[in-house]
């Protein structure tokens, strides 16, 4: 890391609008941990979710949200690491309709939906009562890395602040 700083000293750790550190990103890649995460399977928000997993849902409307209730309480001084990523919609202006890019054709940027990520106590429903959040308005990634101070039941909320395309 630049200047021998670690993630806990980065602007991203301290600022809710900066999801990744400029030098460190989200930190060191642990390939085995990534394997474990994907091996645990997809867990939609229809039931409580385990501490390790992933989901591939969509949110199409501004103001819509998905809550992921963690299936066990978080203990004091434990760490929460959660990441939300999504794609910007770009369409090919396919003038000859062959469904392939040809020289001279262009792309149309449909804009970037603004999604936000919140760590909340399970009983709270207002996002302004969050414990921590990642709320960048210019990135297609949100990331929370947070040390739990108050043990208890938590949920992760994915919130659509602004949907510019669906």
PLM segments and residue spans:
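Secreted peptidase-domain scaffold signal
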Residues: 9, 19-113
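Noncatalytic accessory or regulatory domains flanking protease catalytic cores in secreted, cell-surface
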Residues: 9-23, 108-166
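Short, well-structured alpha-helical segments that form the helix of a local strand-helix-strand
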Residues: 1-6
């Amino acid at each position: 890391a630049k200047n021998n700083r670690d993630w806990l000293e980065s602007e991203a750790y301290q600022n809710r609008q900066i999801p990744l550190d400029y030098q460190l990103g989200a930190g060191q890649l642990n390939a085995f941990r990534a394997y474990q995460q994907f091996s645990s399977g997809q867990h939609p928000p229809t039931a409580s979710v385990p501490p390790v997993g992933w989901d591939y849902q969509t949110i199409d409307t501004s103001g819509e949200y998905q809550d992921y209730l963690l299936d066990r309480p978080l203990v004091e001084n434990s760490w929460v690491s959660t990441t939300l990523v999504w794609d910007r919609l770009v369409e090919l202006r396919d003038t000859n309709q062959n469904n392939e890019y040809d020289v001279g054709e262009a792309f149309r940027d449909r804009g970037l939906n603004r999604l936000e990520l919140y760590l909340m106590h399970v009983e709270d429903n207002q996002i302004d009562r969050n414990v921590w959040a990642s709320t960048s308005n210019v990135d297609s990634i949100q990331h929370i890395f947070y040390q739990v101070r108050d043990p208890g039941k938590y949920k992760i909320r994915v919130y659509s602040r602004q949907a510019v395309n669906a």
